[in-house]
């Protein structure tokens, strides 16, 4: 099995982004969703990205953003990858001249394979915990046994991951990548650098 990639999401400060990169994170995530306690402004994201070394993937997370809002952000912020975390259709995720991943919130009874197949142009699917009315970042894990084998897209596992459980999650799910936000925080939007290091070390 090739090395599992890691993304640290919900970055709001330069020092947290640099700590994640130094620890070995492959990607840094920025939340462009005003209702999130981890939301960043265009200027915040631009400043953080400008401080990053090369070969770090920058990801923008969006939740049911309008085409106008999304276009304005993409014109201003150099994002490598888009992550759609709302009810966006495949057509709404396409056409931005950037690869995208689609987040799917998992609950018992879902046909995850069919949901994955509904986004044929996606670079991957991110599986997160379903909580009513909350698009993501809940800090809660879901039942990994619900994930079917042989999904048509690379699988990014999210939802309640921590330095303590991520190695077990990888062994059981065998994802392409793991995504963490709350599991490496001191408080919402503020990362704990020791937890980031512990998480990345556990992924390896």
Swiss-Prot record:
Entry superkingdom: Bacteria
UniProt entry keywords in alphabetical sequence: Amino-acid biosynthesis, Aromatic amino acid biosynthesis, Isomerase, Tryptophan biosynthesis
GO BP, sorted A to Z: L-tryptophan biosynthetic process
Reaction it catalyzes: N-(5-phospho-beta-D-ribosyl)anthranilate = 1-(2-carboxyphenylamino)-1-deoxy-D-ribulose 5-phosphate
A GO MF term: phosphoribosylanthranilate isomerase activity
The enzyme's E.C. designation: 5.3.1.24
Pfam families the UniProt entry points to: PRAI
InterPro entries: Aldolase_TIM (IPR013785), PRAI_dom (IPR001240), RibuloseP-bd_barrel (IPR011060), TrpF_fam (IPR044643)
Pathway: Amino-acid biosynthesis; L-tryptophan biosynthesis; L-tryptophan from chorismate: step 3/5
NCBIfam families: PRK01222.1-4, PRK01222.1-6
HAMAP family with a match to the protein in the record: PRAI (MF_00135)
Similarity comment text for this entry: Belongs to the TrpF family.
Protein name: N-(5'-phosphoribosyl)anthranilate isomerase
Gene coding for it: trpF
